[in-house]
Amino acid sequence: MECWIPLPQYSTTPSPHFLMTAPNHRWRKFKNALMQAVTLVCAILVVTPLVLVFYHLVKEGFSSMNWAFFTQLPKPVGETGGGMANAIAGTFILLGQAAVLGVPIGVLGGVFLSEYGTSRLNWWIRFAADVLNGVPSITWGMVVYALVVVPMKGFSALAGGIVLGLMMIPLVMRTTEEVLQLVPNGYREAALALGIAKWRAVVQIVARTALKGIVTGVLLALARVAGETAPLLFTAFGNHFWTHKLTDPIAAMPLQIFAYAISPYDDWHRQAWAGALALLLLVLFINAGVRVLTRDRFQRNA
């Protein structure tokens, strides 16, 4: 006995639903392509200023970046050549002082916000830190001038390091807090379940897990204050010679660049361009270190 099974009938004519949705599909693809193009243009616009600045600094200042620039003191007016050796050394001295002041206070403040503080107290501390992050740098300089320079009766490297360190504190503190909050709570709970004291768990487990993130925040803060000029005008003031005591004025690359840029001498202008290029390379080097640290952390987490 033969059995016939009816087969479904397919039509080659497109359905009305397909005819209505096909244009919508093309329109969605067009909007997606348009959005990609707009975001690409915006990304290029973000990178373009850095490329233009770097190109102009290389064009104007690279010719003056020779061995003398890194090893010699500034020459008097009318003499060509010379360098910014004292300003380069002064910049690292100021950054070292800033790190000594800003890193411990900022890191411990971030630990308090993440591990110990109450919600209301934390809100006020975060609010104060965010406000301090937005305070103009010249205001920092005026405050330290009144509190440090005037009582000491003179500008000094110590005052310059203090103002940069104070500017670092809120940024390091907020970065440390955010990094510590990324550590899974399971680490804390496991440590407490084993009877480990909370402070020891924070120091040896939580902080160690977030160490690279904390270092990243410190480097970002150093990169930010490395190019500050206004607060140093009120504190370090500048010096054309080597500084042997922290109680004496000290040269710094931003100050030297500023002094040379406003001068009427062409040779000093070239030195200013070279100094600006060297300062930009320093900041780029610090930021490159930050990228290496964060990339390694993200790859290991992945």
Language-model segments: residues:
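Glycine/proline-centered hinge or cleavage motifs at structural transition points of membrane proteins
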Residues: 136, 194-195, 208
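Generic hydrophobic transmembrane alpha-helix motif, especially the helices
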Residues: 130-166
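Transmembrane alpha-helices
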Residues: 176, 198-234
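Interhelical loop and adjacent transmembrane-helix boundary motif
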Residues: 77-78, 232-280
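C-terminal transmembrane helix and the adjacent membrane-cytosol boundary/short C-terminal tail
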Residues: 177-181, 219, 259-302
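Transmembrane-helix boundary motif in ABC transporter permease subunits
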Residues: 98-129, 142, 291-296
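Periplasmic/extracellular loop-to-transmembrane helix junction in inner-membrane transport proteins
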Residues: 22-41, 55-98, 118, 259-270
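Transmembrane alpha-helical segments of polytopic membrane transport and secretion proteins
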Residues: 1-45, 290-302
